[in-house]
Amino acid sequence: MLMPKKERKVEGEEVIRVPLPEGNQLFGVVEQALGAGWMDVRCEDGKVRRCRIPGRLRRRVWIKVGDLVIVEPWPVQSDKRGDIVYRYTQTQVEWLLRKGKISQEFLTGGSLLLE
């Protein structure tokens, strides 16, 4: 029995809203993967936090070194720990750069952030 092939949508761009950090959330860049769902993330405030990838993200999204993410610091140990809330795609990162929400220096290792 033959199954029909899946149709692929290639017409134009899909318009989606790019999520921005809210409340105490911060932009961050993944610096090192530690294993077991933990990563070291350099945040926009200049601190490096050990961040956990919650199960709802771990099963759906692959997070690599160099990815731009949204980090939510923990209420306790907020300077050292946090949760990764969202990972941006390359297209979304380019949009954030164009709109001036982040700077190229922040992505490449500096701590300069535009707003």
Curated annotation (Swiss-Prot):
GO terms for molecular function: RNA binding; translation initiation factor activity. Residues 14-89 form the S1-like domain. Signal peptide: none annotated. It holds the Pfam family eIF-1a. Keywords: Initiation factor, Protein biosynthesis. The keyword Protein biosynthesis applies. HAMAP family: aIF_1A. PANTHER family: EIF-1A (PTHR21668). Seems to be required for maximal rate of protein biosynthesis. Enhances ribosome dissociation into subunits and stabilizes the binding of the initiator Met-tRNA(I) to 40 S ribosomal subunits. Belongs to the eIF-1A family. This is Translation initiation factor 1A. It comes from Pyrococcus furiosus (strain ATCC 43587 / DSM 3638 / JCM 8422 / Vc1). The gene is eIF1A.
